[in-house]
Amino acid sequence: MLKQLNFKNLLASIMLGVFAAISTPAMATNEAMLDLLEILVKKGSITEGEYELLVNASKADGENVEHNINEMKAKVAKTTKKMPKITTKGKFKVASQDGTWEWQPIGRIFWDSMYVDNDGGTLEDNGEELRRARLGFQGKVKPMSYKLELDFANSGTPSWKDVWLAYNGKTDAGKWWLKIGQHHVPFGHATISSSKYMTMMRRPLFADGPQLSRNVGIAGRFQSKAKNRWFAHAGVFVPGLSTASDETGQAATDRRTTAFRVGGTPYYKDKNHLLHVGFSYQHEEHKGDAFSNIDNTLLTHIGNGDSLEANFGTNADDSDAFDIEAITVMGPFHGIFEYVTWDVSDPIGGDVDLSAWAIDAGYFFTGESMKYKYGAWSGIKPKKPLGKGGLGAWQITARYENMDLSDMDNTGGGNTSTADDGGEADVFTIGLNWYPTSNTRIMADYSKVLDFSHVDLAGTANDAVEPAAFQMRAQVYW
């Protein structure tokens, strides 16, 4: 009996010592330890008095630890209250604690390789190209926002991209902003969507040609509050800056462009199931300056710029352009249709009607969806990024497009060209996109000219040729 009591006392002493040794702040509030004490007292390993003593000590320590933790939290919060927040999730951004200001460096690098079959002609070129190399920053100081970005890919000469300031506001009906500087002309979807998110290496023929990208001007935009479903965007512009030292855009400052774009989602189930429709109008007063010449390559960015050409010289009085667009996102599938037409007033050659259209579609094998935001594409987030248990996002895309400049008479308007029209082409492209992470992408496109005619090339090596090209791109942006 004595041995049994001594054993119990010894066991109790050991338990008390062990508990004292391990009763750190983290363990003092551990429910598992309280359960263990209850088991020991039921088995008689410790007395009721010892049990009460240990439980009370544990609770007291727990309250003391919690108090100390709360004090530490309060001190940290007080110390860091005025310090800026730094976030690095995919992009680096510095912002104030109250959200009144933020600053973010931005940039992108696109490197392209092209392998061409010219079908006996000379319209396209093989090679590699640093397609885009941009650096800049963006941010806000409420209620203002700002952006500045330069591209260094044009033979080493920096060129301005976005350079603007905006005033932001909101009403019960939605959000709005008023922007001044160099920014996108509100016309069409293909040009206004960022190159970071376009599903092909090249935009459609009409977007890389006569559609204005950025000009200097003032514009306003309104976005409805209800699920951001409807928007209106309008502005007045003069020619844009071209190089970092350019002040006037090297063009007539009295040339004016007025444009607007309206659109929205008449069908919206959720962000991955929607239908967008849009309409744009653009009026240019050329004032003796040249019409935005359509001077397009067919397949690659470094090809022959005279494949499709509409040159009015300096005789175009004005021009009107109309654009209709439709976009659908249905889970991993997306589709786009866009049609644009130009009516150019030339007092010597007569009025000319030019047109182009494109239809493209894509599908994510890995289940992602194209991200539609405010009438344009936005970034893709792979469900399982590379390096985090997955292989990124994989997407197949296809596009068929046509540009018809056959109504153009390049012999008129003082133009010395011997051409009778600007040409017409049909091009088909199929592509494969791999998104290892949210900010990186590898692209592979195969493009084929299915039909091509241009009277100016009759009897030459490029007469009715149908070239093809395989292109690849590696891109990163931040």
Model-derived features: where do they sit?
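Outer-membrane beta-barrel pore domains
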Residues: 121-122, 167, 171, 281, ...
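N-terminal periplasmic/intermembrane-space "pro-region" immediately following the signal or transit peptide
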Residues: 2, 13-17, 26-106, 365, ...
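N-terminal secretory signal peptides that target proteins for export/translocation
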Residues: 1-8
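Short solvent-exposed loop/turn micro-motifs enriched in small/polar/acidic residues
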Residues: 87, 158, 211-213, 317-319, ...
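Outer membrane beta-barrel
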Residues: 90-287, 354-388, 393-410
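Short secondary-structure boundary/hinge segments and terminal tails
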Residues: 58-59, 156-157, 345
